Amino acid sequence: MRAAVMYDIDDIRIEERPLPILQPGDVLVRMGASGVCSGDLMPWYVRRKAPFVFGHEPAGTVVAVNDEAPLTLRDGKRLAVGDRVFMHHHAPCLDCDACREGRYVHCATWRSTALEPGGMAQFVRVPRANLADTLVLPAGVSFADGSLVEPLACVVKSLRRAFPRELGTRGAETSALAGRTLYVIGLGVMGLMHVALARAFGAMIFASDFNAARRGVAESLGALRTFAPATATDALRAETGGRLADAVICGPGTPAALENALATTGADGTLVMFTPIEPGERFSFDQSAAYFRDVRLVASYSCGPDDTNDALRFIAAGIVTAGRLDVTEFPFPAVEPAYEAMRAADVVKAIVTFPDLDDGAEFVED
């Protein structure tokens, strides 16, 4: 089989790799679509792992199972050849203290699990442990839509951390954020997903980005007003009568963006750090100003099974889809053009699709 191996942000190679060998309880998935993650655009993040087969936003079709061990998903369903699935690259044990408290990303099993070799390959081995966060795609949900489950799940978790009283841990419904104000900084695909989902929850949304076209997309998804970053603080203050935002999602991982986020978080509000700054870089702020406004600073890293389940539900309901986000599809092996289009911000979202093999034949290395 062929796989896209990332050696650096400007060095992606299509290489031959052997088919993964299935262990008891494992599943082999023929890829249908895999998204290019915004995180894989950060040089420091890529270089600490390279070389590696990247891609952790996958969806595909089960083509083989090793049923020496039970192939049961979290909801009790059994996987079978032909099932169309989303599979999370990390999955928790569901039994430790962290899992019982819903803090899945702090589960030791979650941090040790991975797909082999990665989503930008023609076939992927899903280890038995990862079945704890593997979901069967409903009819009508395309592979491109399925590849949005993981990034949207990160947004679900982010909004839960921004509004814990209103959204709780699972199953939040529309109108939960009626009367609440959200400010989204940065309108890449993750920022746009925040806008679309928060609008479905009934929030009043403001957003900012340097890119005027992205601001237009945000308004089409439900943002009430959008601003250029240079005018955002004053404009938000004017729009809210001085209250500023109940919650701010800071998308860019830069100290300057975080400073703007803090300045626009209202009294008793929450600033969500959605993207890390480069390790070793420092962010300083006026602690006194945050203290006397009762501002909460929280991080939101990745997601867990509660989030992926809700994300798939929102996708199936049409709240966030590949069509609504106007994603651009690139057929494998055009992985490097997909990556470069994302890096240059020429597209909102790049998704690599995998043309079907001959369904009448056994899967083979090609």
Located regions from the model:
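Short glycine-centered segments of the SAM/dcSAM-binding site in methyltransferase folds
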Residues: 84, 181, 269-270, 296
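Helix-to-beta-strand junctions that scaffold the AdoMet/dcAdoMet cofactor pocket
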Residues: 265-267
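C-terminal hydrophobic helical "lid"/dimerization subdomain
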Residues: 247, 259-263, 305-366
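Adenosine-nucleotide cofactor-binding segment
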Residues: 178-187, 197-260
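Rossmann-fold NAD(P)-binding glycine/threonine-rich loop
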Residues: 276-293
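N-terminal Rossmann-fold NAD(P) dinucleotide-binding loop
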Residues: 191-192
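NAD(P)H dinucleotide-binding glycine-rich loop of Rossmann-like/cofactor-binding domains
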Residues: 93-182
